[in-house]
């Protein structure tokens, strides 16, 4: 290996030899010459001196040199600019009264500037033992700046003695600029020693940057005025303004070495980044107006715009290290990190406005406006690392870790508005206005993690442990609403108007989550352990609704009018969720025991809700003065829900002596419910000009409720010992519940009077209610004992309970009264009632036994009972009454009635017992 001191000594020796040779050569060549030299001898003209060709310079072979050094550099600065300008002017004053004026101006120019700074340097040194050192470095820095501008203006006017005038104007701007820069550099060292060892190092970077901008505008206007008072104007304007910035950077470093002992090292590193940002705005507007001699006119305006801005960035960093040693050991390490982000905002729109005035009072005006807005904000990150070590005796270790995360938010919104108003020659006024808005949104988040640790020791024992997790959620939304109104008003006072309003919305939410942990161990003695446990869950939710409102109103001739409204609404929400948990183990211990154990749980749930309503109304008056009013209303809602869960716990244990035990426990639960209700009402009222009227109304309501639930469980156990004796036990149970309730009611009323004096009053009502409940339970226990000598003992116990209950109620009635102008009348009164209820219970149990002894003796027993009970009854009653009068003091009356009763009371008990002995 070449030392720095050796390099310095070698360099001095080389310079000393060259310097001594030059002195000897000069002494030999100029010993007899005068010491006076002309000034032209050292001039820069490049011409040969009077001494001829001078020294004969020797040519050296660089491949055989002990040292070679070369360098170069370049620096430059360039700048330029330019501009131009043109003007024009014209004025004419004519004898005939015509005047003309023209003016124009045009300017443009540019500026450019560039700079450069470059340098390279390389050195190579050889030692006598064959060692070589190479070094080098370079850099390059440059910049470019350029800009340009342009301006153009012109104007023209014309006028004559009749009053006619014309004019036009233009204005244009065009400005551009660019700025860019570069900075890069590299440096290296390469050392190769005679003994085969080496060292290499290389570093570098590169940075770029660029800016762009522009400003463009184009305007023109034209105007004309006629001698008759007419005019016509046109204006146009459009332009664009924007800038952008782009930048990037890149840096790296690489290192590698080998020492005399054979140890090798390497290291690599890089870092990159980039960004882009900017904004841009485009716009355009147009205006035209026209005025005629007859007083008619027109004005039209339109425009649009589009604005955008953005900001984006990326970054990355990577590192790796590796060591390989001569003794076989090694280590490795690497890491990575990266990110990206993006932001975008944009807005655009269009607009128009048109007005017109026609003959005979005709007018119209219309407008339209639309907008569109968008936004995005997104970012993601990730990072990870890994490392590994290898030891002398087969030991190894590994470590990993990583994480990822990100988010995203996005939205879009739109609006629109339109109007139209007009007046026709008859004086009719029409109007139509509408507006709407809608939008969507998105919001997301996620992350993910991972970790791993693994190792092997010198005895071959292995361990592996990992943890993983993830999460994600997502939200979405959307909405829309609109309004519209239209009307017509006539000169005779008649009119009509309509209004409509509507809105909707919907939102969703989703989420997921999971976690997992694993542990694995395997040892050289045959023992092991495998364990995994974790959980996962998800949830989904949705909600939304809509509303609608409509109204109309009109007025006709002769007092005729009408008014109607409709309103409806709907709303809903749903949800469902699920989750799971587990823990699994498989293990073998040093004493030969093997264990298998699994636990699993699961839960699910879902629900849904809904509501709706509808309301209407109507009122009207006809030409005769008859009036009518109607209203109706409806409403309904519902609810549904279900849920379920399950659990399992299973375990098996095996021992080295062949004894074994097994257990298995499980349970399942379910539940559901449903509820719904509804209401409805109607009312109609009529009032006639002749004094007759009618009033009719009705109402109804309903309710329902249903519930169900179950619970199922089982416990099982078994064991066998080393001698062959076994015992087992199983337990089962079941519980069920069911209920159903309902209610319904209704009523109606009528009140009317006719022209001849007849009057009617009528009322009805009805109520119905029911209820039903069912419950049940089952239980069972089974046991068995078996001995190695053949003895067996068995038992079986069963029991059950049932319960049922029901109820019903009914109530209905009807009353009516009819009277006439002659004094006669009729009355009706009817009614009905019913009530019933019934309840029943039952229970039972059974015990069974069996025994067989080793000497052959057998015996059995069977004992049980059953109980049942029923209790309840019903009662019903009704009546009817009528009364008729003739208005002269005579009447007829009828009465009917009925009533019934029933009662139930039952009980039963049954028992049995059987014993058998052999």
Swiss-Prot record:
Biased composition, class Low complexity, residue ranges: 79-89, 270-281, 430-441, 632-647
Compositional bias ranges of the Basic and acidic residues kind: 103-127, 515-533, 648-660, 673-688, 738-765, 800-814, 830-846, 883-918
Coiled coil stretches, renumbered: none
Domain of life the protein comes from: Eukaryota
Residue ranges of the region described as Disordered: 66-150, 226-283, 326-481, 515-548, 594-707, 737-774, 800-918
Amino acid composition bias (Polar residues), ranges on this chain: 326-354, 363-372, 379-404, 534-545, 604-619, 661-672, 689-702
Name under which the protein is recorded: Uncharacterized protein F59B2.12
